[in-house]
Amino acid sequence: MNYNNKKTLKDIDVKNKTVLVRVDFNVPIQNGVITDDNRIIAAFPTINYLLENDAKIVLFSHLSRIKSKEDKLKKSLAPVAKRLEELLNKQVKFINQTRGQELEKAISSLQSKEIILVENTRFEDVLDDQVVKYESKNNSELGKYWASLGEVFVNDAFGTAHRAHASNVGIASNIKVSAIGFLVEKELKMLFQAVNEPKKPFIAILGGAKVSDKIGVIENLLPKVDKLLIGGGMSYTFLKALGKTIGKSLLEEDKIDLAKHYLEIGKDKIVVPVDTACAKEFADVSPTIFEGNIPDEWDGLDAGPKTIELFKQEIKKAKTIVWNGPVGVFEFKNFENGTKSVCQAIAEQTQNGAFTLIGGGDSASAAINMGFKDKFSWISTGGGASLEFMEGKELLGISAIQDK
């Protein structure tokens, strides 16, 4: 999909306008403390542009999932407002409501260059202890109500770009002027370049737990790539399809035939592990390496040294690299070697001029936690959204934005 025709922030007038901005502040919080503020910082180009251009800014974001009254007590955006204030060095008025007089009054008295952060949009998923999902099912009245609070809507939340929620599609469909923010614009540009206009050789590295999560990506990318490297939990279903024994490694029994089909149509392209780092239990213990077959009682938890070498050789040839999903249980120190080595090899190839993109989710957090934050061309902020883009699917949150 190409979204080049969508209005961007620079196409619209924001001076003295009340601008509703959907950001993605869905950050990890432990005991009231934000442990990773990358998503907050990612929204700064848009927020700073709006401040410089005299906008009145109203920020909307979700935080986690809300399924009960108890969740609401634990998942307020209050700590995010505090952190945002510290990072911007500017007052952020937090309104602990998602609708009502207090919110309306605060917005109507907002001055240029002032910022309001509205409470977690997903609080609208539970009302009076009833699960109603007004936000996540895009309740039409809620979308209209939020849209009525502003004059302009900017969607800068790539993390929910594939969802039709009241706070993105709902507002965009009910407001006169809408545009995408700088983060979303950059995400779309980078993904389009990687998936639709790749310099050859083009390789994709797919990992993560399940084949079923990556079917759409495999089907969209297999005709385009020169090589498809398969690692992580999903690789054991492919190894089983090749007739290997996989011990008690992760297996999707009902996807073996599909894996066989992919191996047949992509026989010159698909690269699977040749050895595996295993353990007898799912624990951070010293690994045992098996080549070829994995014996009974053993669980494959990472790529083995020969597989890592094989992957590195392919990465060294590439001019475009897309990576989605870790190649091992990187949360265990003893089984992080595959994912870390892939990170290192991609980082080196980026320095050699390759265009490299890491899909969001686990591979992005692995890369960032391992110290590779600035070593790739782009690390996506949206796991599900980048995956759906790679599948060639429409991103509903972007489609709802006005064309130029």
From Swiss-Prot:
Reactions the enzyme catalyzes: (2R)-3-phosphoglycerate + ATP = (2R)-3-phospho-glyceroyl phosphate + ADP
Pathway: Carbohydrate degradation; glycolysis; pyruvate from D-glyceraldehyde 3-phosphate: step 2/5
Keyword Mitochondrion: no
Positions that bind substrate: D24, F25, N26, R39, H62, L63, S64, R65, R122, R163
PROSITE patterns named among the record's database cross-references: PGLYCERATE_KINASE
Main location as per UniProt: cytoplasm
Record keywords: ATP-binding, Cytoplasm, Glycolysis, Kinase, Nucleotide-binding, Transferase
Protein name from the UniProt record: Phosphoglycerate kinase
Family: Belongs to the phosphoglycerate kinase family.
EC number: 2.7.2.3
Molecular function as annotated in GO: ADP binding; ATP binding; phosphoglycerate kinase activity
GO annotation terms (biological process): gluconeogenesis; glycolytic process
Subcellular location: Cytoplasm
Residues noted as binding ATP in the record, renumbered to the chain: K214, G300, E331, G360, G361, D362, S363
InterPro entries linked to this entry: Phosphoglycerate_kinase, Phosphoglycerate_kinase_CS, Phosphoglycerate_kinase_N, Phosphoglycerate_kinase_sf
Organism (species): Mycoplasma mycoides subsp. mycoides SC (strain CCUG 32753 / NCTC 10114 / PG1)
